């Protein structure tokens, strides 16, 4: 969480300062006057006010590592070029095309079905495949075992080192992930695409994680992911019974309604 906090602060500091420097060249956006930026309110300020309003000061961030006086002075003097500066987008499709996880999400699964307007696609964690090849484990039979486990490495016969390395989002501590995103949100003026992962059936658990996200000051969540939606087809080839084979034979058209 500490690393995420410091990294996001660095991005925020430079993004806001750059927008103010652009305002010096090209002027502020049209409705800058009277805005929160104009009033000297940065994302960290509005975040702190929100937590105070909700009386959650115990989780209020203790400032940051950087000296923001330069940013505040620049905004006061030159304004801001962009009314909206930062957001974290989902990036699922482009992430999977490039072989990485979407957005700021943890590993979803080492094998799952991804559905979009173009159809359904198998998404495989290529790093996992490479590691299994190095261990001499990867084979057609092992690939079927991964399918049977729905990409859940905790169900595979592999070393604990790899089970920990490729632990899926469903096995992560959701409250810790919420804490990580709260560390990001305090520096970001817009929202964060943040999926919640659920392998429980308890309504209380769902209520608890959504309330935790709200209390942490997150502006948004995205999808609620359940295990069932990511299940993969167990076999790439359908096995037909002897009766089905006879009924569907081209030499026996009268036995199949579809052929009549």
Predicted feature descriptions by range:
Residues 11, 240-243:
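Short secondary-structure transition/capping segments
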Residues 48-55:
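Polar, glycine-rich mid-to-C-terminal structural blocks
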Residues 24, 28, 61-65, 74-240:
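Catalytic alpha/beta core of large soluble enzyme barrels
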Residues 55-69:
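Active-site Gly/Thr loop motif
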Residues 244-260:
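Short acidic, low-complexity intrinsically disordered linear motifs used
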Residues 38, 198, 244-248:
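Acidic, glycine/proline-rich low-complexity segments that act as flexible tails and inter-domain linkers
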Residues 1-46:
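Extended, well-ordered alpha-helical scaffold/bundle regions in very large, multi-domain proteins
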């Amino acid at each position: 969480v500490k690393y995420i906090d410091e990294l996001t602060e660095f991005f925020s500091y430079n993004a806001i300062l750059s927008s103010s420097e652009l305002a010096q060249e090209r002027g502020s956006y049209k409705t800058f006057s009277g805005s929160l930026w104009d009033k000297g309110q940065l994302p960290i300020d509005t975040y702190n006010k929100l937590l105070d309003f909700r009386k959650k000061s115990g989780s209020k961030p203790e400032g940051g590592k950087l000296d923001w006086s330069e940013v505040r002075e620049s905004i006061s003097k030159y304004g801001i070029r962009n009314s909206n500066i930062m957001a974290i987008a989902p990036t699922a499709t482009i992430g999977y095309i490039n072989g990485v996880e979407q957005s700021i999400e943890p590993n979803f699964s080492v094998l799952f079905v991804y559905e979009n307007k173009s159809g359904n696609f198998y998404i495989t964690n290529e790093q996992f495949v490479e590691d299994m090849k190095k261990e001499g484990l990867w084979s057609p039979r092992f690939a079927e075992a991964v399918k049977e486990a729905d990409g859940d490495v905790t169900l595979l016969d592999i070393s604990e080192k790899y089970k920990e390395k490729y632990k899926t989002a469903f096995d992560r501590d959701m409250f810790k992930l919420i804490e990580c995103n709260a560390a990001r949100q305090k520096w970001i003026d817009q929202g964060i695409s943040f999926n919640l992962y659920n392998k429980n059936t308890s309504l209380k658990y769902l209520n608890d994680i959504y309330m935790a996200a709200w209390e942490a000051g997150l502006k948004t969540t995205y999808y609620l992911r359940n295990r069932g939606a990511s299940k993969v087809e167990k076999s790439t080839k359908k096995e037909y019974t002897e009766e089905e084979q006879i009924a569907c034979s081209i030499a026996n058209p009268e036995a199949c309604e579809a052929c009549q």
